[in-house]
């Protein structure tokens, strides 16, 4: 089996395993599957769970797509790939829970390969996971980062610190001067050693459930009211802003003629903006700002 097919098989299995775990955690709703094809090449399967007991919407998509010309979002920082054919596969998910005390989360793992005249000229892995709480708890954030740190250990002493820092820098809303959440791991252009890099991708993909599901179980029965719900919807607006303004994956998908429904499944089903909103000083809502700056959560 060639390298691309090995990655592809892992990713389809990962999607299946995460769906099964999320359905078990929700206990009510199940994923609906939408199979699709892309005219230029490839396709995928998008799965959406809606109106569950725990999750308002959970989307997880697998795609395997190809093309004859790289979109600007991909070739801008790799001009030597202009004119190359390409193929990319990945799994991407975003979960939006009902309860404002359960954080929203995102995970993505992907593999990209470019060829010219039948020769592979570039290949790399990318991905990571990050957490976006609305009412954060130190124990949840520390658990999230402990899992991230542990899965990085076999890949070198500096791996966690480097990819945590990359996550903090990538998921940053410059126009708001705040991070999207409390971070996690982020990496891209990882292509020095296929076996080692593929092992790291698997560690990230497999570690996601260990990082997230215990937080869901801990917070899913926390009582909340209209105030918390309104704040959750307001903060979801930041999520939308990041995905539509900064996210390279969203831009790549749209610029490459990708399937808009699948690309935009990351957006929350309900969201609101409020002009000039400022949380009451000393409130639980105001406390969130202390978490939206890069920090050493395990120090």
Swiss-Prot record:
Role noted for this protein: Involved in the heme biosynthesis. Catalyzes the aerobic oxidative decarboxylation of propionate groups of rings A and B of coproporphyrinogen-III to yield the vinyl groups in protoporphyrinogen-IX.
Pathway(s) of this molecule: Porphyrin-containing compound metabolism; protoporphyrin-IX biosynthesis; protoporphyrinogen-IX from coproporphyrinogen-III (O2 route): step 1/1
Name of the molecule in the record: Oxygen-dependent coproporphyrinogen-III oxidase
Catalytic activity of the protein: coproporphyrinogen III + O2 + 2 H(+) = protoporphyrinogen IX + 2 CO2 + 2 H2O
Chain's gene name: hemF
InterPro entries: Coprogen_oxidase_aer (IPR001260), Coprogen_oxidase_aer_sf (IPR036406), Coprogen_oxidase_CS (IPR018375)
Keyword Transmembrane: no
Sequence positions that bind a divalent metal cation: 96, 106, 145, 175
Cellular compartment(s): Cytoplasm
Principal location: cytoplasm
PROSITE patterns named in the record: COPROGEN_OXIDASE
GO cellular component, one term: cytoplasm
Keyword Iron-sulfur tagged: no
Location of region: Important for dimerization: 239-274
Self-association state and partner proteins as the record states: Homodimer.
Positions of the record's site feature: Important for dimerization: 175
């Amino acid at each position: 089996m060639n390298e691309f097919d090995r990655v592809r098989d892992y990713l389809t299995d990962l999607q299946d395993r995460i769906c099964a775990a999320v359905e078990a955690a929700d206990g009510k709703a199940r994923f609906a599957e939408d199979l699709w094809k892309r005219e230029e090449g490839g396709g995928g399967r998008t799965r959406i769970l809606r109106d569950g007991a725990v999750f308002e919407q959970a989307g997880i998509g697998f795609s395997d797509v190809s093309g004859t010309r790289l979109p600007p979002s991909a070739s801008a920082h790799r001009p030597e790939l202009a004119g190359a054919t390409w193929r990319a596969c990945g799994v991407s998910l975003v979960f939006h829970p009902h309860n404002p005390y359960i954080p929203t989360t995102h995970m993505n793992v992907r593999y990209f390969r470019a060829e010219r005249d039948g020769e592979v000229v570039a290949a790399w892995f990318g991905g990571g996971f990050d957490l976006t709480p609305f009412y954060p708890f130190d124990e949840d954030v520390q658990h999230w980062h402990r899992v991230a740190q542990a899965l990085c250990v076999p890949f070198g002493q500096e791996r966690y610190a480097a990819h945590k820092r990359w996550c903090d820098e990538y998921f940053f809303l410059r126009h708001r001067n705040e991070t999207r959440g409390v971070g996690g791991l982020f990496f891209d252009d990882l292509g020095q050693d296929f076996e080692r890099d593929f092992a790291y991708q698997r560690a990230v993909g497999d570690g996601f459930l260990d990082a997230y599901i215990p937080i869901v179980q801990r917070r899913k029965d926390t009582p909340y009211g209209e105030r918390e719900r309104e704040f959750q919807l307001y903060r979801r607006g930041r999520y939308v802003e990041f995905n539509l303004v900064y996210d390279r994956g969203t831009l790549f998908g749209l610029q490459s003629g990708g399937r808009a429904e699948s690309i935009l499944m990351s957006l929350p089903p309900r969201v609101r903006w409020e002009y000039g909103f400022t949380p009451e000083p000393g409130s639980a809502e105001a406390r969130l700002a202390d978490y939206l700056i890069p920090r050493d959560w395990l120090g």
